[in-house]
């Protein structure tokens, strides 16, 4: 006799919903999902509309209690900021998922879709999906408020240089732009003999002072003034001032060193030419091609002044030029420049062509000069030199003429210049009419000195076509390989192409 095996598969039982009578699978609440949702709202207590503050000037969002952060639209950082606004109500439920719902970037609305779970009647777990609407409200942050107020600052750096030329400031401006040291400034003010940098915190100003000490030879003094105080909480409000003084020497200046300093630099001659000012003063002896670098501390220990300013440059024409092959070096002499060639030249002033008066001198420009060339230099023989070191020198050791640089046609150089530099956004007052000429001198220095160009970002000017390399004068030029493309990349919190989120 055989017995039929009973099937072990059993269909799950069904019960009726206690509210609507619909057959459902058994659950701890004995109620269907539709009726459970109609009776219990697990999102109760979570606000469906929240406000969030946004600064239009700096494109940042406010994160309580006092922080402003920059977030792109629909980014993880912005989602975290939105969830923190409803952190307390969300702590009572379990957050399963969160994500943005697309909105128009200019609608001043952010929508976040949330999926939450919570245990309800008799241990039943209910899941619900809903949207929280964030209203973006305009609010100016503290930093932008200080910028607009123009007088609310905590620290100021006053950079000064006692010279008649601004070549060092133009070079310093390019270094600040290259390394982004201007980003924390509230405003930059240009005055006749320097620049003023305003900051919202003393730490940012100290960082800028350290940068200046690394890039140009200078010294500084710090002071502070008490603005207000609270005797109950023992807090004080100060305004700090940093006075930075750059050495009063610029490129192409003729200087006279003290005998002690000249001896310490390798027994070089006291009359030297400044060929470059970077983190140190670079000098060259036009009689021997001996070079030396003087840092800021050495300069302030043994100060010296410029004998002539750029407005005293005179134009000479080269009558004869010969290269000195055998350079005699004294005992203990310093390093000799390999980029220059020592030459002996006879020159005559272009303003004295109707006379037969000529001047003889040695120059470090022997590799550039040929008979008939024009050259700029200082006439020391007919100049009143009011310098304590020159007055003590033997007159035979003071040259009649010191040649500085070869002269080219400035109009042609400007016309063929297919590059440009960026400038700091700053306030200007009491501008000198000579500033444009000084700026053109700085641009010419960049073309002539490769060592300075390495520290400067040079951008190609697309408005000026690239000409051929044929040059009848042989004036120095900047190659295309040394230029950068001028790109404008906007950091926009909306994620759109250059558009502001709020108008």
UniProtKB/Swiss-Prot annotation:
Keyword Translocase: no
Necessary for the nuclear export of the 60S ribosomal subunit: annotated span: 425-503
InterPro entries the UniProt entry points to: Nmd3, Nmd3_N, NMD3_OB, NMD_SH3
Main localisation: cytoplasm
One MF annotation (Gene Ontology) recorded for this entry: RNA binding
Superkingdom per UniProt: Eukaryota
Single biological process term from Gene Ontology: ribosomal large subunit export from nucleus
Residues where Phosphoserine is found: 258, 468
Motif Nuclear export signal per record, residues: 480-489
Placement of sequence motif Nuclear and nucleolar localization signal: 405-422
Annotated compartments: Cytoplasm; Nucleus
GO cellular component, one term: cytoplasm
Signal peptide positions (record): none
Pfam family for this entry, one: NMD3
Disulfide bond entries: none
Residues modified to N-acetylmethionine: 1
Outcome of substituting residue 484 to A: Reduces nuclear export
Entry's family note: Belongs to the NMD3 family.
The protein's assembly and partners: Found in a 60S ribosomal subunit export complex with RAN and XPO1. Interacts with XPO1. Associates with pre-60S ribosomal particles.
Function: Acts as an adapter for the XPO1/CRM1-mediated export of the 60S ribosomal subunit.
Entry protein name: 60S ribosomal export protein NMD3
Species, as recorded: Homo sapiens (Human)
